[in-house]
Amino acid sequence: MGVKHLEFILLTHPHQDHIGGMEKILSDTTIKIDKIYGNDLNIQYLKSSEDKSKQSSDETNWTEFDTKIYKNFKAALEARNKLAEEAEDKTEKENLKVDYVVPTAGETISLGEAKMTFYGPLENDYQYGRKVDLNTRQENKYSIVTKIVYGSNSFLMTGDAQKETIEKIIAKGYDLTAQVLKEPHHGFQDVTEEELANGYQYSDHKTVIDASQASIAIISNG
């Protein structure tokens, strides 16, 4: 595409389908990157067994995000900034340096004439949850939700946020109303077969749908 300057990048959470290209982008020193927004690089979350059949809220440990893709991203970011430190030319140093920023919930930044508000990261007190690949679900809870406002147009961007994420944002009193809602987790409904068999009729996303009052919802996969 020929893009050689990225003013900012937002990493919602450390999954392959959300940050998979970051290692390559950071390794391309011809691309200038001003800022990367994301969770604390050393954040810990409750994790259970890698064996899905053995995952249980009774057997969890606080663990750093340790997906291979996240480790590779952090290594690439460190390598990029090391090159910046070692560069002798001022312009080269500025073009290589990448600022990593952990946003504050409620913070608003300007994107030209648009504004983007961060609704995370929030307090790290998520409980270990329901029986649908609990480790993946747990990581998704840390998705950074944002709202972009441009004139009279508004867009709520949710990453792979879980119901618990949205509930916590609402409890903080943040305004999630928007014209357009990007459905969390590609529109995927994270309910168990047992719940469906017992007559569970509501999507996990009903909470954010109701809160956003959006007239348009975008589902990338479903």
Named regions from a protein language model:
Residues 1-38, 172-190, 213-217:
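Active-site metal-binding motif and surrounding structural segment of the metallo-beta-lactamase
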Residues 1-5, 88-180:
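Core dinuclear metal-dependent hydrolase active-site scaffold
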Residues 51-119:
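Extended active-site neighborhood of metal-dependent phosphoesterases/phosphodiesterases
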Residues 128-135, 185-202:
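Acidic/histidine-rich helix-loop elements
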Residues 199-221:
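Conserved beta-sheet core of the metallophosphoesterase superfamily
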